[in-house]
Amino acid sequence: VPDLYDDMLNTFSPKKNAAFEFCEAVYFLAYKDDKVVGRIAGIINHRANETWQKKEVRFGWIDFLDDIEISRALLDAVSEWGKSKGMDTIQGPLGFTDFDAEGMLIEGFDQLSTMATIYNYPYYPQHMEKLGFEKDADWVEYKIYVPDAIPDKHKRISDLIQRKFNLKIKKYTSGKKIAAEYGQAIFELMNEAYAPLYGFSALSQGQIDQYIKMYLPIVDLRMVTL
């Protein structure tokens, strides 16, 4: 599933992406015989580096033909840029934040990818290994089948927890109302819940405002419960 073109342009634009409050980036294309044969983004997330006490340059949005010289040239370009900025380690694929697609597919190439994940050909991780990169973390995707009826045990546990903690379920008919009443709280909760995740950096107020405006008014309310 390819990215939406306008979304990608907005992500790469300092005028459109609030992550540039604490990130800087550079973009490279690889050419061979006057044809584009690869691309890569280099990113320094200063907030993440401060949080995790590291000096890392990230690479993301990497694509290349099956030619080791192309992949080497792309990654060398980001490495050299990172060194010029005082970084001592390169990691990726990562984006500006955890809301960008991350990681590299190493199995499940026969499965349909989603817009929230990265698809790449099997030769991609092979190139990374040949270039001396090592896996540092695993992201695992699961397919969960929802039963036609809620199991009685799950229903009893749900009822018990709701009574014990006085929990109530709220459903909305307006994305704008969710944004107005709970938008700030939703993303503050995400900052707290996502804090232990690999390479996470807390969303700034500018990013929270941006995501509230981008996503909450258009969410599928059938999928949202508070």
Predicted regions and their residues:
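Conserved GNAT-fold acetyl-CoA-binding loop/helix
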Residues: V1-P14, A195-K213
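Short alpha-helical segments and helix-capping/turn motifs at coil-helix boundaries
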Residues: T11-K16, C23-F28, I43-N45, A73-V78, ...
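A short helix-loop-beta-strand connector motif used in the catalytic cores of GNAT acetyltransferases and
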Residues: P14-L29, K213-T225
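Conserved beta-strand in the GNAT
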Residues: L29, K35-N45, L226
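Generic, well-ordered alpha-helical scaffold segments in large soluble proteins
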Residues: I43, A77, W81, L189-A193, ...
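Acyl-donor binding region in acyl/amide transferases
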Residues: T51-A137
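Acyltransferase donor/substrate-recognition loop-hinge adjacent to the catalytic core
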Residues: I118-G199, M223
